[in-house]
A protein has these predicted regions:
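Helix-loop-helix junctions that connect adjacent transmembrane segments
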Residues: 2-6, 44, 120-125, 154-275
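Hydrophobic transmembrane alpha-helices that form the core helical bundles
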Residues: 34-38, 46, 55-134, 138-142, ...
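C-terminal membrane-solvent junction of multi-pass transporters and transport-like membrane proteins
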Residues: 151, 184, 308-317, 354-403, ...
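Select transmembrane alpha-helical segments in multipass membrane proteins
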Residues: 8-19, 83-96, 129-133, 185-197, ...
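Alpha-helical transmembrane segments of multipass membrane proteins
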Residues: 112, 116, 135-139, 167, ...
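Membrane-interface "cap" regions at the ends of multi-pass membrane proteins
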Residues: 1-33, 37-42, 54-59, 71, ...
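TM-loop-TM module centered on a large, flexible mid-protein loop between adjacent transmembrane helices
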Residues: 76-77, 114-119, 226-286, 304-341, ...
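Membrane-interface loop-to-helix entry segments
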Residues: 110, 124-173, 184-186, 225-228, ...
């Protein structure tokens, strides 16, 4: 199987921008207050813990990704390491995560628009705005990956500038007296805070999915992953420092960055942060559509979903059927849903998918016929083992009824669909 019917238009710094855009989403605009309410100034340690956990997982992704040039990401790695059934389950879970996350973030986008235009949250205007956003991003993605990536680069710059302004100006207004170190948090509180914060660091995996549209993906993926994670981790920690140091009522804030900015930049500063949030969410929506559609495209190529999903546009050479399918489902989900507290479910599901990629590193290292790695992770086996152990630690601390059960149900549905497709393929060509 080859991806050469797709245009390889994504370069090193393009991909770095994509990774940053994927990671920095709506989470960082709301989570600083949530983790501070849970564990106080120890939230800074939680940010560092998250950065270390994700760094280990990224290390595994970088090596595994360097073995492939095709589109598919974790789905493709699982297919080579564990076979079709495991790959379908990974692809299915990830597709569900991407669509539901898009729907939630799109609703959040409308909520933020309401800061400047209260009528935006009205039923009719809300539906119209949702449709406009989905159609706009769909057209951009169908017209070409180059145009989509250029839009992503714009969103990356647009979201980083307000955040950098927040940090660079806010550091001069930090009050050391706000950093009161109390008793160490309880184990469960710290674990919950870390799991909550992981959401702010996820999304990097979207960047490795469209490898078939990258220039020298085996070289640029490791570079982009490490550079982007370093930038994001440093920025997040500084954001938390400024939030704690400038906003005494941080624990009770619903818009912590906007409220903190209002303290040292005035109402205009709060408005700038809201604009940054809008740009950030739009950027995530764009790369989410890229990642979600490419997962379905890859599954269509492997005949684990209808082959029509692998069709590419004759002129633009983009997987337009997969993009359109994602757009239609996303539109319906977004209109009929709201921005609910599904953060833990999405995070836990992603962590499970990450664990499969870490496990595949061990499998490929021990398989003599595996494609050679263009990047070898230092202490790769140990990093993979520790990553898997950390995922198990986090996953076993979730509420089974609220998060565990829904994930199990979705996973079982995926298994049923896999065997239904398998039976159908035997009786007729898809």
């Amino acid at each position: 199987m080859t991806d050469e019917k797709l245009i390889r238009g994504i370069g090193r710094w393009d991909l770095t921008a994509v990774v940053i855009n994927c990671i920095i989403g709506a989470g960082i605009f709301g989570l600083p207050s949530k983790v501070y309410a849970a564990i106080g100034v120890y939230s800074l340690l939680a940010f560092i813990a998250c950065a270390v956990i994700i760094a280990l997982i990224v290390l595994c992704h970088a090596e595994v990704a360097s073995r492939f040039t095709a589109t598919g990401g974790a789905y493709l790695y699982a297919k080579e390491a564990f076979g079709s059934a495991g790959a379908f389950e990974v692809g299915w879970l990830y597709w569900i995560v991407r669509m539901s996350t898009f729907a939630a973030n799109c609703n959040l986008l409308i909520t933020y628009m309401g800061f400047f235009w209260p009528a935006a949250t009205g039923p009719a205007i809300r539906i119209g705005l949702i449709a406009f956003v989905v159609v706009l991003l769909t057209v951009v993605n169908i017209v070409g990956v180059r145009q989509s990536i250029q839009l992503t680069n714009f969103f990356t710059v647009g979201k980083l500038l307000p955040l950098l302004l927040f940090v660079l100006v806010g550091l001069f207004f930090v009050q050391p007296s706000n950093f009161q170190i109390g008793p160490a948090p309880e184990y469960t509180s710290f674990t919950t805070a870390v799991l909550l914060l992981i959401y702010a660091f996820v999304g990097f995996e979207v960047a490795v999915i469209p490898a078939g549209e990258m220039k020298e993906p085996q070289k640029i993926i490791p570079f982009a992953l490490f550079v982007a994670l370093a930038v994001v981790a440093a920025l997040y920690i500084l954001i938390q420092v400024v939030s704690i140091g400038t906003l005494p009522g941080l624990a009770a804030s619903e818009r912590p960055l906007a409220d903190a900015a209002a303290n040292f930049l005035g109402p205009l500063g709060a408005g700038v942060i809201v604009v940054g949030a809008l740009i950030s969410i739009m950027g995530n929506l764009n790369v989410g559509l890229i990642g979600g559609s490419r997962i379905v495209f890859a599954m269509g190529e492997h005949r684990e979903m209808p082959a029509v999903l692998a069709k590419t546009h004759e002129k633009f050479r983009t997987p337009y059927i997969a993009i359109l399918l994602n757009a239609v489902i996303i539109l319906v989900l977004t209109i009929q849903s709201s921005f609910l507290s599904a953060l833990a479910i999405a995070t836990v599901t992603r962590l499970i998918i990450y664990a499969t990629t870490c496990l595949s590193l061990i499998v490929f290292r021990r398989r003599p016929d595996a494609a050679p790695a263009k990047y070898t992770a230092p202490f790769g086996i140990a990093a993979a083992a520790v990553s898997i152990a950390l995922v198990i630690w986090l996953v076993t601390n979730v509420d089974f009824t609220k998060e565990g059960l829904p994930i199990i149900v979705v996973a079982v549905v995926g298994i049923v669909l896999y065997y239904l497709f398998k039976i159908f393929r035997k009786s007729a060509a898809i």
